[in-house]
Amino acid sequence: MKKQLKVIIYVDILFAVLLLFFWFSLPKPLFITPTSYVLEASNGELLSASIAKDGQWRFPLADSVPEKFKHCIITFEDKRFYNHLGVDFIAVVRAIRQNMQAKSVASGASTLSMQVIRLSRKKQRTIFQKLAEMWMAVRFEVSYSKEEILTLYAANAPFGSNVVGLEAASWRYYGRPAENLSWGEMATLAVLPNSPSLVRPGKNASRLIIKRNNLLDKLVEEKIIDRATAQLSKAEPIPSAPLPLPQNAPHLLNRFKDEMKALKVNTTRITSTIDENLQKELNRLTAQYHQKFAANGINNLAALVINIKNGSVVAYVGNCYLPQQKEMESHVDMISARRSPGSTLKPLLYASMLNDGFILPQTLISDVPTQIGGYSPQNFDLGYDGAIPADRALSRSLNIPAVKMLQQYKYERFYDKLKKFNFSTLNKPADHYGLSLILGGSEVTMWDLSNAYLGMARTLNHYNDYQGKYNNADYGSAYYVKDQEKPEEVIEPTSLLDHGTIWSTFNAMEEVMRPGDEGLWQQFSSSQRIAWKTGTSFGFRDAWSVGLTPNYVVCVWVGNADGEGRPGLTGIEAAAPFMFDVFRLLPSSKWFEMPKTKLKRIAVCKQSGYKASPICETKLVQWVPPVGEKTALCPYHKLIHLDAAETYQVTNQCYSVTQMKHKSWFVLPPTMEYYYKTKNAEYRILPLFMEGCQQEQTAVMEMIYPKANASIYIPLEIDGNRGKAVFNVAHRNNNATIHWHIDEEYVGTTKNFHQIALSPKPGKHTLTLTDQNGERLVQVFTVLDKEK
């Protein structure tokens, strides 16, 4: 009895050990082979793919297997697939009998389950390994459904050369997804894993045709297809050389590779938000412009299109992809590259100053020769307007007014604002950039720049959705993974920019003159309204254009990846036409809704753009952000006293008060006036004082160059002698005569046109100017000696 009990215990232990061995004999995961990175459009169509790390074209596991492939592979490899548990014993007996009769391996008995095990283990084919495969195949069937087994087989079966898996084979041999293959094409692929090294497209074509046709005949016998379908399928040609896979978004594919961990994606396949048709059209358009630009030595360009309503990227062309021409550097993703932004940050400064109550939309900004601590900005046309409305300065992209605005706003404050806009490339202190920050003195990426304008547009679009409040998640990044988790809404009473500010800024951006025939856009009712801004970096290295409607943000860049500048490489000439052609690919939309509760109507001085003072001559009522009510009153309108004929200014010391006429007069500072009157014929110069009248303390002269306490450098000429600097002063009287003295030494006299070339010695000097009426202007300047 005890002996029998021991036997039972030993048997139970042995059974338990075998059961444990059986259960843990199947490795997890089954396959650890690297897979290709695969990028799909939003509709599931393949956009781009890259080869796996081991040099194989092997797509990640698919969700399902096409029905045609199921029928073909089961008929060809394992006709009792749905009726066995991993091992087909009928096939085993048949194989043993046939092999004994042939005295060699003439037939196999591997089921699809056994083949999956063999593919995962990669062991040599021996009797022992065959038995191990049978054991593990049974275990495999316990844990996996038949559909899962077919899916694993289809993803890992060899299809000749370096092609693994049905999906990769379908694209490599037929150039389209497996779901779209015919019966003949699917039958061809189904016979390849049986002997991929012997029978593959491009080699042994006759044997491949025989195997395919035999399979088609079996499908007829099984009544899966009819004879007519089989005959038509047999007439189809077999593929020859492998085809290249689609590369419609290679730069986005590489971006996905780099960001895979951050995206928390556990597969090398993603379905993106890209619109397949738009992406292909944008690739075509990019190629056209590349051909045009290449003649001027401009090799690279990029375009990004974002759907504002949901923040999804719908088209991503990081460069004109020309891998066969390595000198073009088309592999560089210019959407991620750091480049000088040129003037593309100016709307953000304009908006920030509106939002914080520094200006109104049309506040006059100084546009005169400027030197700030050795920094001398220049307008692109090298001219000066004297003074120009802020919105007009933005639409014309004038540099000097932008620097003046940043000087008023403080570059440290603007730097902090840009950080809140999530510009990731501002990795140096604000002092490193200084005032050049507004003229391209930093580096940005197309991605960050587009996201800044995306955030503004989304905020304005959501004006009604949040009852005038703000979802600060609107300033989050755009996304390109279709099922990417969206950030939670964060509803706040305030935001980076209020609705009224954004609406006013977009209106100013809409007034930019469009290039070429686009300048006539307002004459066509079908032309949509677009807020846009161009940018050109120093040395003509980068050309930008970013635009937006309520539905889309479009950002384009043109230039050379290596930073080489080219003549004509400007935002308006190179990037803007490209951007407007991109907008033509998109559906038109209405303009942004006016956020009336976030705007107020106030009286504004027509001439200065400031909040109207009581003495402003002409007042306009304008919609401005509410903070505009707290801005300064017009500083340029002054009440002056004239004689009865309104010819001269007078005072009560020289003229009867009862005969005086009191007028409000628009008076700019002398330097601003000097340039402003040349561009504005309606500007009236302040009348002179009547002879014998004591003048009020109003400046009649102002130095244009050099400014008070300026340090200047006078370079040497070619012959080694010291050159000359052109000194320039503005006077209110067009007919004034000015006598010039340096350190009390007379150096010359000017009349009407007050410029004089001088060459003072290095050191500190006192400049004294005296006009014909005895009015004096005295200021100090220093000449630097860089020879020391």
Show which residues each predicted segment covers:
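Short pre-catalytic segments that frame enzyme active sites
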Residues: V38, E45-F59, A168, S197-P201, ...
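A penicillin-recognizing enzyme superfamily signal
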Residues: S272-F293, V305-N307, Y316, Q324-A337, ...
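Juxtamembrane regions of bacterial inner-membrane/periplasmic proteins
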Residues: K2-A295, S312-V314, V368, K404
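Glycine-rich, acidic and aromatic/proline-enriched surface loops and short helix-turn segments
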Residues: Q115-K122, A155-N162, E179, W183-S195, ...
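Acidic/histidine-enriched alpha-helical segments
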Residues: D88-R94, M136, E167, S206-L208, ...
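Soluble, non-transmembrane domains of envelope/secretory-pathway proteins that act on or interact
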Residues: M1-L5, E485-I491, R529-K788
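Residue-level preference for non-acidic, small/hydrophobic
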Residues: G44, I73, V116, I149, ...
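Conserved catalytic neighborhood of penicillin-recognizing serine enzymes
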Residues: Q101-R125, E179, P242-D258, I359-F414, ...
